[in-house]
Amino acid sequence: VIFDVLRNWLEHQGLRVRLVRNITDVGHLTDDSDDGEDKLLKRAKVEQLEPMEVAEKYFWSYEDAMTALGVRRPDISPRATGHITEQITLVLDLLERGLAYESQGSIYFDVSASEAYGELSGRDPADLIEGTRVATRSEKRDPRDFALWKAAEKGHIMRWPSPWGEGYPGWHLECTVMSTKYLGDEFDIHGGGLDLIFPHHECELAQAKGADKPFARYWLHWNMITLGGEKMAKSKGIVIALVELFKKYDPMAIRFHLLRSHYRSV
């Protein structure tokens, strides 16, 4: 809703806006580090569906809810699974520049070699040591390093061929690739929830700058909707589906309610 208002205002000012909203249909693991299970695969097992069936189901459910709230669709909705070649190309570029390394069929971004890492969140990379939401994997040189490409384990359904064997892209990689493909190496605004500043957006920026892409000029982060004092999240079972709210309240009333507060307030 926030981005819809911003888009409308910018267009009202006479500016031409291209809005891109990516669809993460592979690579988003259940842990912010490089451990855990792909969220889409996990959901597919629960619902006994193919991963792409799950992606389609929730994509259209989300689109229907946004339409009810009066949110216009983006100009482009690229999917991570449709941009595997471009993601491999960026990994090869970062390897050539000495900003990444291969380990057991996976490729990791070398945080120690990046001048940009920590720039967005204001965190000192040296302070990110073991035990601070950074998992230690034996195949990493440094626990702070993050996956660009993951080797597919036996039985992993979503996998693609690559120069390093079959695998799948890391969560951060796809966003850097798709945003720069459709908006250029430098674009105006990148947004998301406050919880994405670190590590997700931090990693996106490090990847982009590592490939000499200036990336976003401005960052817009909004706060989370809370329920009982906790952030609403499916992973914690703290969630109310919009479709359920629509049964009780007019969607425009919900839109108005969401816009009553500053976008960074709780």
Where are these regions (language model features)?
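NTP-dependent nucleotidyl-transfer catalytic core
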Residues: 1-205, 209-221, 234, 251
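Catalytic adenosine-cofactor/nucleotide-binding cores of aminoacyl-tRNA synthetases and other
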Residues: 213, 221-266
